[in-house]
Regions:
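N-terminal "arm"/small-domain region of PLP-dependent enzymes with the aminotransferase-like
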Residues: 1-59, 148
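Active-site phosphate-binding strand-loop segment of PLP-dependent enzymes
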Residues: 133-195, 303
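Conserved PLP-binding catalytic core of the aspartate aminotransferase-like
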Residues: 275-276, 289-320
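PLP-dependent aminotransferase-like
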Residues: 9, 98-154
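Conserved PLP cofactor-binding pocket of PLP-dependent enzymes
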Residues: 12-16, 296-297, 304, 320-342
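PLP-dependent enzyme catalytic core of the Aspartate aminotransferase-like
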Residues: 168, 319-320, 331-359
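PLP-dependent aminotransferase class I/II
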Residues: 64, 210-295
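Phosphate-binding glycine-rich loop
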Residues: 65-105
């Protein structure tokens, strides 16, 4: 039998991500700087609830994640009718694109998170890429490229550059897009780990019906393996997404972990404090290594420009049990960029010493 499929699927190439599995090395002793997770990992309260809830695995999960949505309402101040959860932020990205953007025009600044492009391609979108290391430096030009009856994607803070747009700048983009009947999809998965002022637009979803804000518990609470994300938007958008959402996509352990995690606000505060301190440590030391240049960052990772080949450097560091993110597969970057997560001082010190030794 000859199997036929849509051309968008036949030509689709999955996005390459960080992490030990992507690097093909599961050695538990490796210090993973390639995944941008909270430097203090998972809260102890989450570990505890996961153990106590194992007996409930015999039952189906709550189809509507009722208790988690209720908890998110208290955590964010957003009404339950304006919230939806997913099996990680990724599920929500793909559901949004397939539901609202089929064959439409989208604007994607690059370099940025690759799944916006991937999901848009599967939805047969016409993509305009806007190359910039910082949208704020090309702001008016970027706004002029917003399509009609389409969508603009913004990662804020941006992965992998670490740049962040202000709430005022984002509001201007939202208004410009609204005049063109376009969505604005803002990914705030890293915004809770920004030590400085809060530039979130989460509370604007009731004011602007073209705004869609994505969040994740993965980064802030160290829950990468559990897969739990959420989004906020107008009730109309959320109601439509609920209709096409895969049943039971958010499992019981994910729901329970999320409920407990968002009660632990001190975890976020501690993470921010470490990130602020360790960013200064890493940048000051790495910038002093010949042919290494750190970009400024608002959040828990740093993009670094290097003279040597990024893949070769990644292999060298793996010999020292250190995994970094090779950024050559980010559209808009090349094999002279790497990204590192900000981790504990002990881990950061190890990275600096090894880089100084091998460079």
């Amino acid at each position: 039998m000859k199997i036929r499929t849509k051309n968008a699927i036949a030509t689709h190439n999955p996005v390459i991500h960080g992490g030990k599995f992507s690097a093909g090395n599961r050695d538990p002793s490796i210090v993973d700087f390639s995944s941008n997770i909270s430097p203090i990992g998972m809260p102890a309260s989450v570990k505890s609830i996961l153990k106590t809830k194992l007996s409930s695995m015999k039952d189906y999960p709550d189809l509507y994640s009722t208790d988690l949505i209720s908890g998110l309402k208290k955590y964010t101040g957003i009404s339950e009718s304006n919230l939806i959860v997913g099996n990680g932020a990724i599920e929500i990205i793909y559901n949004f694109c397939s539901t609202f953007l089929s064959k439409k025009q989208v604007l994607i600044p690059v370099p940025t998170f690759g799944e916006y492009e991937s999901a848009s391609k599967l939805a047969n979108c016409k993509i305009t890429f806007f190359k910039t290391m910082n949208i704020a430096e090309n702001f008016d030009s970027f706004i002029s490229k917003i399509p009609r009856n389409g969508c603009v994607f913004i990662c804020n803070p941006n992965n992998p550059t670490g740049t962040i747009l202000s709430k005022n700048q984002l509001t201007k983009i939202i208004l410009s897009a609204k005049h063109k009947s376009s969505f604005v999809f803002i990914d705030e998965c890293f915004i809770e780990l920004v030590p400085k002022s809060n530039q979130s637009v989460l509370n604007l979803v009731k004011k602007y019906d073209n705004l869609f804000v994505l969040r994740s518990l993965t980064k802030s609470f160290g829950l990468a393996g559990i897969r739990i994300g959420y989004a906020a938007a107008s009730k109309q958008i959320i109601d439509i997404l609920k209709k096409i959402k895969i049943p039971w996509s958010v499992n019981t352990l994910a729901q329970e972990a999320g409920i407990v995690a968002i009660k632990n606000t001190s975890h976020i505060k501690k993470s921010k404090s470490i990130i602020k301190k360790e960013f200064n440590f890493l940048k000051s030391h790495i910038d002093n290594i010949p042919n290494f240049e750190c970009y400024d960052s608002s959040t828990n990772f740093i993009l670094i420009k290097i003279k040597q080949d990024s893949t070769k450097l990644q292999k060298k560091l793996l010999k020292h049990k250190i995994l970094i993110r090779d950024c050559k597969n980010f559209r808009g970057l090349n094999n002279h960029f790497i990204r590192i997560a900000i981790k504990s001082h002990k881990d950061n010190l190890k990275l600096v010493k090894v880089l100084e030794k091998i460079s």
